[in-house]
Amino acid sequence: MCRTTRQGDLAEAAFMLRATEVGLKLARPIGGDVRYDVIVDNGRERCRVQVKSTSSLYRKNVYQVKAARQEHYGNRKAPKAVGYLASEIDFLAAYLVPEKTWYILPHAALRGRKILTLYSAGHAKKGPCAEYLEAWDLLL
């Protein structure tokens, strides 16, 4: 199993554990034809969540997470990064592995970005996504 697949599986498991701890009900899609990893049921609605993670710093106290999927077009050898559509996911959950910290971003907060810059707790500034740090209430 490649390292990124293993890290992704571990991040999904960590998300499901934390989401269960805050009182959410969860389901996983079967098959690989959907863009989300977990379905969250809060008793009123169901949300599609894409889980991402990173374990390495981009620069001091700053992480980056890909907020895109890879698609192959025609004869292109290299895949192209394509941002998630609102019709594909409702939330992106980004896990900073060394920090054991989650960012829970609604799709609208992605604003078409393919890379998210996320600040650690030790950073002097709050960062562009600070309001989504441990924002589990958005899923409740």
Could you say what each language-model-derived stretch is?
Residues 52-100:
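Catalytic cores of nucleic-acid endonucleases
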Residues 114-140:
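Charged phosphate-binding loop/patch that engages nucleotide di/tri-phosphates or the phosphate backbone
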Residues 26-33, 43:
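Active-site metal-binding core of divalent-cation-utilizing nuclease and nuclease-like domains
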Residues 19, 38-40, 47-53:
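Conserved catalytic cores of phosphodiester-cleaving nucleases, focusing on short active-site segments
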Residues 42-44, 98:
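A generic beta-sheet turn/junction motif
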Residues 1-27:
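Acidic-basic catalytic patches of nuclease active cores, encompassing PD-(D/E)XK
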Residues 32-36, 100:
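Short acidic/glycine-enriched loop/turn segments that link adjacent beta-strands
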Residues 91-124:
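Domain-level recognition of nuclease-like catalytic cores that cleave nucleotide substrates
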